[in-house]
Curated annotation (Swiss-Prot):
InterPro entries per the UniProt record, alphabetical: Ribosomal_bS6, Ribosomal_bS6_sf, Ribosomal_S6_plastid/chlpt, Transl_elong_EF1B/ribsomal_bS6
Keywords, alphabetical: Ribonucleoprotein, Ribosomal protein, RNA-binding, rRNA-binding
Protein known as: Small ribosomal subunit protein bS6
GO cellular component assignments: cytosolic small ribosomal subunit
Pfam families reported for this sequence: Ribosomal_S6 (PF01250)
Homology family: Belongs to the bacterial ribosomal protein bS6 family.
One example of a Gene Ontology biological process annotation: translation
Length: 121
């Protein structure tokens, strides 16, 4: 089994219901092709580095997928014709870091401890 990290960027005017539909749609494609979604992260609305199809922002969703390579072919074939998506990217990895949340904010407790430890207010 191969391990992949797959990120999709939806248009900024996509509703939360449509985002949920996109997530379910691509999850079903993975399961139909003998794969498994290990983890899903919703990174939310983020600024794009440059304007893509008249959008300055995009809604990012990230999947950690385990399965054969045909899953990625099928995903990318469907994503290429989806009008709600601006971009998609897949990276093959050797192992998953399930504890890392790429865009999560630090816990308030950690911030307070840091300030206390280094005498910063």
């Amino acid at each position: 089994m191969n391990l992949y990290e797959h990120t999709i960027v939806a248009r900024q005017d996509t509703s939360p219901a449509q985002v949920k539909q996109l997530t379910e749609k691509y999850s079903k494609i993975v399961e139909k092709n003998e794969g498994e979604i290990v983890q899903t992260e919703d990174w939310g609305l983020l600024n794009l580095a440059y304007i893509i199809k008249k959008n300055k922002k995009g809604i990012y969703m990230h999947f950690k997928i385990k399965g054969p390579g045909k899953i990625i072919d099928e995903l990318e074939k469907n994503e290429a014709i989806d009008k709600n998506l601006l971009r998609y990217m897949t990276v093959k990895v050797k192992k998953f870091n399930l504890e890392a949340k790429y865009f999560s904010k630090k816990d308030e407790y950690e911030k307070k401890e840091y300030k206390k430890e280094y005498n910063r207010d």
